[in-house]
A protein has these predicted regions:
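A positively charged, amphipathic N-terminal helix/segment that binds anionic biomolecules
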Residues: 4-5, 59-70
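A basic, amphipathic helix-loop patch mediating RNA/tRNA/ribosome contacts
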Residues: 10-56
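A detector for short, charged/polar N-terminal pre-domain segments
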Residues: 1-13
């Protein structure tokens, strides 16, 4: 498993934007498709809302990649 850290610069980041910023998805459209397909989990729960607000302390997982948001 590959672990990543992401430092927020505001209160939250939308899930699809986070995947694109960390290059876990090749584009915004690809990120939205991955989320819609149920390939992304937030804090251990499958997340299908592309604009889900991700805040500090949450953990996002896509395949073998895990992102800790700080």
């Amino acid at each position: 498993m590959t672990q990543h850290r992401f430092e927020l610069r505001g209160e939250f980041v939308e899930l699809h934007a986070l995947l694109k910023l960390l290059a876990l998805a090749s584009s915004g459209g690809a990120a939205k498709a991955m989320i819609a397909a149920g390939e992304v989990s937030v804090d251990g729960q499958t997340e299908t809302r592309k604009a889900c607000k991700i805040r500090a302390g949450q953990v996002v997982r896509v395949g073998e990649d895990e992102v800790r948001v700080e």
